């Protein structure tokens, strides 16, 4: 019986304890594909300095959300759910996954690291991998960096890969986001039954920011963020704005920032704000700390009520989206025998 192509989910990773915060930050800031800290020979020394200076404050933030990042546990749960629905599929002629598909997880900046997972997969007999980055919108700083590291490692093991670069406007992914938004709007009374409009609610799409230099060099990230939003607002008639969060490092970042946008909306008289973390597919420090704690407190001080839509995590609709993306990838790779 032929061995089906395995699936590898790639994600950022996050510290699994408070003690892991500083080395996680060092790994993050050491990557020139995410942020360039002077000449290349100074990257690691500057990364060490920045990670040491930021570790204390970052540890305080993680201590408020359980003492670690939940991204590892959630990503493994997503992998388990995806593996289950893939193995319910039958009929390889139609492009469905054959019985026995395995879904693994690898992280860019913390365990399980890509460089550790790949040799384990090879030892287990894996020779073909469908690679799915859990960043819906492509950027050289996220998906690009992860895939470059993966290619570097797989080259030593003879594993053939097919990488899915982005899926920012995949219909089932959009449906999952829209469902999450509809659920989130219930806090404010839901949608109008007649017009499908949210009454007195302003939606703020908040995406992870990116150094402006990447966009100037042709990175499609911002365009794909807007593409995701365009697909959403075709399904829900809502007033909305777009902002960017999680800036870090001494460079110019894409704006407007989320805190600036909240202040601007408050000045316009907006009272009810529903935040949609549009570039994230799971909970981590950006949702649980930045949005749920910092931005929520800021909004309250400005006389606003801020709520966040639930992250996709293992939402059944989202898992079905991942399944469809993977199955189409198997077809495109020519591995649907």
List PLM regions with ranges:
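Active-site-proximal alpha-helix that buttresses catalytic centers in soluble enzyme cores
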Residues: 1-337
